[in-house]
Amino acid sequence: PFERLSKELAGITPAVIQAILSGGPLPDAVAAKSLAYIRSDLVADDDSGTQWALPLPNPLACQWLKVWLLRRNRIHHQEEPILEEYNFALANSAYHCGGLMAIYAAIQQAAMPDVNTGIVERYYASAIQMPALVIGQLSSRSNHHLEKLENKWLAGEYQKKLQQVSVALGTAIPATLNLEQQSYFALGYYQMGAKLNQDKNEHIAAKKAAETTKE
């Protein structure tokens, strides 16, 4: 993945170096190429996840998006904090739409681990461009998927995360997303997905440790 992403960005390396040296914004092509890489990587093959792990975008591509956004925000005097982990306090609807997308995908994956085509593979490309058309559909499906979950701890965690992100998002779901908003969407999906995977792994480890102690 690193070599492929490097090739994607190779054509704009001089412009990136110039931006770094001058302290100016990174070229928009950095975000556009990173988003295209993430989209093709997730949509082309949804098998990168497992029953216990949600497929995530390439971390390096997400880091490029973050740097592009931070420089852009600084130059436009928009000091929105972009943290290393999911930020429920971030006032950005596109970011929280990405967070919801990750939760919906994780819910389906847990409820239907053997499904041939997952939510990420089927809906990510359209959700990152036109979230208003997709989020509502996924919300309805997630209710059905939650009912099928036998793991009550997992169901409770997903419901809690859904409530938190829904409160942060509010009722204004964007109809379309521009380049900057799509970058926030991708970061929101990545950070929430990483958080869900981490929480699940920690729960599994704690459960195994408790069972070992009983023995």
Residue ranges of each PLM-predicted region?
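Intrinsic-disorder/low-complexity detector
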Residues: 1-215
